[in-house]
Amino acid sequence: MQYWLMKSEPDVWSIDQQIKAGEKGADWDGVRNYQAANNLKKMQKGDLCFFYHSNIGKEIVGIVEVIKTAFIDPTDKEKRFVAVKVRFKSKLQNPVTLENIKKTKALENLSLIKQSRLSVMPIDTKSWKIILKMGKIN
């Protein structure tokens, strides 16, 4: 299993909308950056992803699970980019802010800090566990 972080602007797609999508999940589409799209292509069924609210809040608010691997993004008319399907797993009891991540020495090499414009990025196991603890998830 691999771990990831996926960013969404909450006024476009929020964790609450993801929850409402239920067990059938929802397409994670609209990614138009090649590096982020390549990360989507690497995702496997069962991988877990932090759900990050960008622009408004700038915080990790929940976890989603990949339930369908990469397929042609239905919102891409040129059919160059991919989407995955994810379903809600849990909300963090304590959202983990970008500010708190930046203050945590053990997380200083996260792509979230180093490549702040990247919308889909891998998270190493050690960082995943640290963020879970910060978010009060066992």
What are these regions (language model features)?
Residues 14-16, 58-60, 74:
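Short acidic/glycine-rich loop or secondary-structure boundary segments that cap or lie
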Residues 62-121:
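Aromatic- and Lys/Arg-enriched surface recognition patch
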